Amino acid sequence: MADLINILNHFVQEQPEAVAVRHTNDELTYKQLDEESSKLAHLLQDSKKPMILYGHMSPYMIVGMIGAIKSGCGYVPIDTSVPKERVNMIIDKVQPEIIFNTSDETLEQTNAQVLKVSDIQDSQYPIVFDSQMKQNDVVYTIFTSGSTGEPKGVQIEYASLNEFAEWMVSLNKTGTGKEWLNQAPFSFDLSVMAIYPCLTSGGTLNLVDKDMIKKPKLLNEMLVQTPMNVWVSTPSFIEMCLLLPNLNEQQYSSLKQFFFCGEILPHKTAKALVERFPNSMIYNTYGPTEATVAVTSIQITEEILNQYNPLPVGVARPGTKLFATEEGELVIEGQSVSLGYLKNEEKTTAVFNFEDGVRTYHTGDKAKIEDGLWFIQGRIDFQIKLNGYRMELEEIETQLRQSKHVREAVVVPVYKNGKVIHLIGAVVPTEPVEDNLAMTTHIKHELKSRLPEYMIPRKFEWMEQLPLTSNGKLDRKKIAEVVNG
């Protein structure tokens, strides 16, 4: 099996002065990335616990990742946007010996040794380190939200990461030495889709920070300054960027490939993108954190757009098997599946199975296969009951998005005494709404031809933009707070 450190070493030899990572004017070459990560690996080599990697979009976050891989201890990435209470819960769960803090923020009381960027830069350790990471070692642990409020640490094996990076490089048709855009913070595993495929193809990883996400104008400046070739983001992020009228092939002719993951890619968004970038390759992918980022892919073409709505997530990647249970729940089997949740046997045994050396994960996603392609139909636990009727909120959202008056939509249940009493549609219209009542009546009339009466939202809230989480996904919690007043 491929080993990403060996591949990285190849590019260090071949193109030492090429830029490996860039954030605004802060850059590290392949040589610098190799040397700085080797110095860090020397500091980490006696650590028996994963290293906590704290920060935002500093290139030294990548130094931290590569250094932790070389040392064999692995890493736990935490973005500065993560609330302090949650950071403390993660530190408490991991019990790290070393924290590499690349930010200016001070972490609260911890018994771990805290390293700063200057400690690595000033270190006199040798700039060479032979990687100690074995294929069956845990390379990273990413914490996802738990239903009880306690975050769950998803442990990913080095072999799984290598297999994933190799697959992604095979999907990337732009070639080696390209400019990659990464939107996701490092505590969100979508970032893995950009980091390792980029570095194992000799590319430059360009980091989008939270200010650029808040102000697309800053992102536009970055795109003008550095023409990108490969784009990796959530669908919600590209949806926001499509508000920039000049985000098109004429303006950005170098942008040849898009990868989307993390949430459902709406048909309308994909269609708008295909119209603006007719000669680019647009990939829709699907996968939970528990199965190493993504396990399916499909190139979205005019033909696919004309044939399917909602869009498929494609076919399983090599080495991964997918099947649906009688209830329609998608189960993933293969090397991509995580080793389970860190120090949480109860949660692990509930959704993972490791019998006979075969790893499976029950996703909680509803899925079907049609024409040899997989379709994700929302969360099994995203069903609600209204007046005795069981329904999928995402199905209503899909139908809402069909309207030419709707650019984006989210459906929010309104609860009273723990029971759903009605639904509200939060809608971003394609044009400003002059008469709310008339537009609501019109949309309801449209929905009547596609949905039963009980699934139609009682009222609609018209919004300029739907809020996003720090990961660049739709912030359903915030939307619910806004519409519920």
UniProtKB/Swiss-Prot annotation:
Q: State the Pfam families in the record.
A: AMP-binding (PF00501), AMP-binding_C (PF13193)
Asked if the record carries the keyword Membrane, the reply is: no
**Pathway membership of this protein?**
Cell wall biogenesis; lipoteichoic acid biosynthesis
| Major location category of this protein | cytoplasm
A molecular function GO annotation? D-alanine [D-alanyl carrier protein] ligase activity
Task: List the GO terms this entry assigns under cellular component, sorted alphabetically.
Answer: cytoplasm
- Binding locations of ATP: 144-145, 284-289, 365, 473
Keyword annotations of the record = ATP-binding, Cytoplasm, Ligase, Nucleotide-binding
Compartments where found: Cytoplasm
Q: Quote the record's binding site residues for D-alanine.
A: 189, 293, 473
Task: Specify the domain of life of the species encoding this protein.
Answer: Bacteria
**EC number(s) per UniProt?**
6.2.1.54
Catalysed reaction, written as an equation: holo-[D-alanyl-carrier protein] + D-alanine + ATP = D-alanyl-[D-alanyl-carrier protein] + AMP + diphosphate
Any one GO BP annotation for this protein: lipoteichoic acid biosynthetic process
- Please give the InterPro entries that the UniProt record associates with this protein: AA_adenyl_dom (IPR010071), AMP-bd_C (IPR025110), AMP-bd_C_sf (IPR045851), AMP-dep_synth/lig_dom (IPR000873), ANL_N_sf (IPR042099), DltA (IPR010072), DltA-like (IPR044507)
Which PANTHER family does this one have? ENZYME, PUTATIVE (JCVI)-RELATED (PTHR45398:SF1), PTHR45398
Reported function:
Catalyzes the first step in the D-alanylation of lipoteichoic acid (LTA), the activation of D-alanine and its transfer onto the D-alanyl carrier protein (Dcp) DltC. In an ATP-dependent two-step reaction, forms a high energy D-alanyl-AMP intermediate, followed by transfer of the D-alanyl residue as a thiol ester to the phosphopantheinyl prosthetic group of the Dcp. D-alanylation of LTA plays an important role in modulating the properties of the cell wall in Gram-positive bacteria, influencing the net charge of the cell wall.
Protein family: Belongs to the ATP-dependent AMP-binding enzyme family. DltA subfamily.
Q: What is this protein's record name?
A: D-alanine--D-alanyl carrier protein ligase
Q: Which organism is it from?
A: Staphylococcus epidermidis (strain ATCC 12228 / FDA PCI 1200)
